[in-house]
């Protein structure tokens, strides 16, 4: 038990609130339920990177939008009697509790999702507990490091531009001030390493392992999440080291699509999602300012979406359409859920606003207040229905295999 308040260092909140995290998950489940439960669609779903952000949302839509049995893989820190664990641990625990209350199969694996050990455990559970096959594999890993399964070598990714230094207006989120951010370009080695960590190699290893073990159902699909963003963030993102990794993901999708079409009449796609506040996006320089602006503009235009809205739309309007039509894709075979964010009217408003923002008018011209609230929400804070001066149980256990 502990009384827990937020402590923010840099772009990380170092504390989490178990009750707040549980209520966040409950709200996401309710949002999905409101759209109705479908009988068709995916029934046995594996989510790699299932404890927060888009991966968690993908698991929630599968379970509570389509009554699917789900297996989630993630790397989180459990809480103890005296100390809170990571937000993802409590998110996964809450998901498990609500899924089981619904009579759905739910199991989780806590360990390194990049490891062969995790793949072996997943295959074992699919064979022994999930009827032998899965029909959807969601790949949603966002990690700054990857330990290579063959050699044990640890590779790190770099959030850097390519070619020349990147200078831009940004928010110092600790001081709530507008600053000039400058980032030196990535070296060739850093670019290669970023592709190794954030590209399609591990996704390919997962699908190869699952296909090799014959645990992919007829018609099985796989989707990996990506972000392209607008040209405002391109120097640091799409045209930076991370963009190279995401292009590798695109190429992997084309290979996997051919493989699955041939082997199980299935398919593979990259899904390009909109920018949202996640632990991953808050680490990217310039993103907090861009998010604060784009949220305000999209809210004004009535097209703002959170993580859960995006995933519900991906399943319902793209992948599993009631009219049975194939998903609409772009010229590279990608599912585009960033379509509303990239509308000309939205982006032009962002570009017009960008040079006007100063420390003095930051809260007035943008939804930075909303950004800050959503950031703290990720860790279970800033909820009106939680008394943060009360003791809360931190040692939460659930149906999770520890690797």
From Swiss-Prot:
Substrate binds at residue 227. GO terms for biological process: fatty acid biosynthetic process. The active site is at residue 237. Keywords: Fatty acid biosynthesis, Fatty acid metabolism, Lipid biosynthesis, Lipid metabolism, NAD, Oxidoreductase. Gene3D superfamilies: NAD(P)-binding Rossmann-like Domain (3.40.50.720). InterPro entries: Eno_Rdtase_FAD-bd_dom (IPR024906), Enoyl-CoA_Rdtase_cat_dom (IPR024910), FabV-like_NADH_b (IPR050048), Trans-2-enoyl-CoA_reductase (IPR010758). Its EC number is 1.3.1.9. NAD(+) binds at residues 49-54, 75-76, 112-113, 141-142, 246, 276-278. The keyword Membrane does not apply. The record marks 76 as: Plays an important role in discriminating NADH against NADPH. It catalyses: a 2,3-saturated acyl-[ACP] + NAD(+) = a (2E)-enoyl-[ACP] + NADH + H(+). One of its GO terms (molecular function) is trans-2-enoyl-CoA reductase (NADH) activity. Pathway: Lipid metabolism; fatty acid biosynthesis. Monomer. Belongs to the TER reductase family. Involved in the final reduction of the elongation cycle of fatty acid synthesis (FAS II). Catalyzes the reduction of a carbon-carbon double bond in an enoyl moiety that is covalently linked to an acyl carrier protein (ACP). This is Enoyl-[acyl-carrier-protein] reductase [NADH].
